[in-house]
Amino acid sequence: MKEYQVYLERARSRQQDFLYPLIFREYIYGLAYSHNFNRSIFLENVGYGNKYSLLNVKRLITRMYQQNHLIISANDSNKNPFLGYNKNFDSQIISEGFAIVVEIPFFLQLSSSLEEAEVIKSYKNVRSIHSIFPFLEDKFTYLNYVSDIQIPYPIHLEILVQILRYWVKDAPFFHLLRLFLYHFCNWNRFITTKKSISTFSKSNPRLFLFLYNFYVCEYESIFLFLRNKSSHLRLKSFSVFFERIFFYAKREHLVEVFAKDFSYTLPLFKDPNIHYVRYQGKCILASKNAPFLMKKWKHYFIHLWQCFFDVWSQPRTININQLSEHSFRLLGYFSNVRLNRSAVRSQMLQNTFLIEIVSKKLDIIVPIIPLIRSLAKAKFCNVLGHPISKPVWADSSDFDIIERFLRICRNLSHYYNGSSKKKSLYRIKYILRLSCIKTLACKHKSTVRAFLKRSGSEELLEEFFTEEEEILSLIFPRDSFTLHRFHRNRIWYLDILFSNDLVNDE
């Protein structure tokens, strides 16, 4: 990284970031390999062993150097002169190189900013992604209205590149990036379809994540600027990491650019109790006040996306609901605020009267229907939730079959221990338990009852329900830990964010 820093310091002295030559350096792709991002694309063909192949990278760089291979050929659609004959393999290597190179200047900006004393002092105000959980616990019980917003994708990837051009001044680098995306994503179309973006994001996760995070960071910077300016109380400034990428110079830039444009509209948005939470492509906007101000923010988001980022968003896709009547989905959970009503008898002198007390409680519920749908898709049960056998696993040993089912149960228990009601989680465990028994019975060509009677596997299969309690009994003191407390309390594990299949809200 010191070599990159010296290189970029020379570029800054010329008021420009020259990233283009770095694309043709072999150590860039070695850096991508060492960071373990999409490691499988650098493997040799079958028979050469699982070793990093510099030969493929050298051949690719040679083709990129040649002048005739950088000419866009509209007539030859089957053969790609830029990516060669192995389009998928080469495109993944190039995307890794682009992602590494474009992250370097921003990483150095972030490192230099963290070395400053004022930024280090503000560490206590840095908001982590894990702060979502205490936020849901502490704040949502005092809020009344919530808006569930799906952040729209840009209609064309050119928008993402244009946003990035404001911060990186290197025309040759962006010409090469456009050329790569033109061949891979069919930029000759007027509108990039969602299917094409999805395919590109799966094949080039790091590059797409960087471009998409930059787009989200841009609009959130404007939103946070307005949010801080529109509060009745002066908020203490803080810095936010938006999924690894945040640039501190943006704050001063926003004050200069947007202060004049929004100086007359800020009184319309004054709401000190508005809260904003985002994870991946979904955000939650919640407020304590009347829905009128929520509608103002809703139209603000729509106009910001349409006018500033050229992203089309329908107003009907953003709904404003009461927390006590509707639930919202975030991080794989269904959440709402439940009203608990209780009556208290009070006596004053000779008069006795009842006082009704209404308290709020946050309910975080396991999404049972989507989970059953996922289990049915994986052939553990039918669409009604009735367990079925898994014949594909019948060739494995009994121990391996039981261990596979237990691993799934562990992951589900680990993820959904933050739920306030465990009944749905136990139902999922019950489906997996019976599916495991039926799979073992199918392997031994026997009925479920005869298999259990012959093998005595009932005690072994009880691990589906007892293993989590045993683990927690080792964490908490035995005198304070009880089974009733385990059923009642929520336990958040901070590593659940790595379970992408469960976190994904789509």
UniProtKB/Swiss-Prot annotation:
Family: Belongs to the intron maturase 2 family. MatK subfamily.
Bilayer-crossing regions: none
GO CC, alphabetical: chloroplast
Molecular function terms from GO: RNA binding
Chloroplast among keywords: yes
A Pfam family annotated for this UniProt entry: MatK_N
Keywords: Chloroplast, mRNA processing, Plastid, RNA-binding, tRNA processing
InterPro entries referenced in this protein's UniProt entry, alphabetically: Domain_X (IPR024937), Maturase_MatK (IPR002866), Maturase_MatK_N (IPR024942)
Major subcellular site: plastid
GO biological process: mRNA processing; RNA splicing; tRNA processing
Role: Usually encoded in the trnK tRNA gene intron. Probably assists in splicing its own and other chloroplast group II introns.
Protein name, entry field: Maturase K
Intracellular or extracellular location(s): Plastid, Chloroplast
